[in-house]
């Protein structure tokens, strides 16, 4: 999954293949912004897979590149690519054990890792990370090869954004990015105006429940999606991080729009999510 983000980490456009990736990648980009701040440099690339930082499960590694123009220090855009690696360690090959109870059971946890420094892959350091921990990756050469492909994607994306700006100007490009997001927001608001309130409940195989109440406000053209009553965090791997809940909600509302709009940050603006603390979602 590849995507372009604005300077705040807001999703602008993407290749619409895996919605749960695309709806959660903004949280990963924003984690890098929070952790790195003013130290972000053009030519650097970062990676992470931490579920509490916008990740999904550990085999999905997100590679992120800031796009910084000459003479400037702050990123104007970000590009990112999330890919599923065949194995990142864990107690079973493939890093998806059915009986995992702790995050380290699923493999190597990566958060805010510098992958490329000013165009140079930090391969020894990256190998050391994948080979560390109680359950290291089983084929680090393959991980490195996959990461090189992801790096190529984000670097090419950054180059294309710079070419776009050189041709049309920064002001015009950023204005159209905002327009794309604003248009998506307006389309979702039109959907909300037609929604009726409802309550739904889904039982899980483990005896837990996911509960959701949809509470539209037609006058404000906003909607509250309230997950109050959902079961508490389980002592197994049936839990989902917050970013995944946001991504699933975003995708549902995108499917209610008939027009051909990209999935982006604008789709989320009219939505208010209420998610209980320490719940399974």
Language-model features, listed with the residues they occupy:
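A glycine-rich phosphate-binding loop feature that marks nucleotide/adenosyl-phosphate handling sites
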Residues: 1-4, 45, 49-52, 170-171, ...
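Extended, hydrophobic alpha-helical segments in both membrane/secreted and soluble proteins
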Residues: 5, 188, 210-214, 223, ...
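Conserved mixed alpha/beta core segments that line enzyme active sites in large multi-domain catalysts
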Residues: 10-12, 25-68, 201-205
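Extended active-site and interfacial segments that coordinate phosphate-rich ligands
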Residues: 18-32, 65, 79-117, 228-252
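Hydrophobic core positions in small helical hairpin nucleic-acid-binding modules
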Residues: 20-23, 54, 236-237, 241, ...
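A short, hydrophobic, proline-anchored segment that marks a local hinge/packing element in signaling
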Residues: 62-70, 80, 216
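Mobile "lid/hinge" segments at catalytic clefts and subdomain interfaces of large enzymes
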Residues: 70, 74-161
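Accessory "access/gating" subregions that flank catalytic or transport cores
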Residues: 155-233
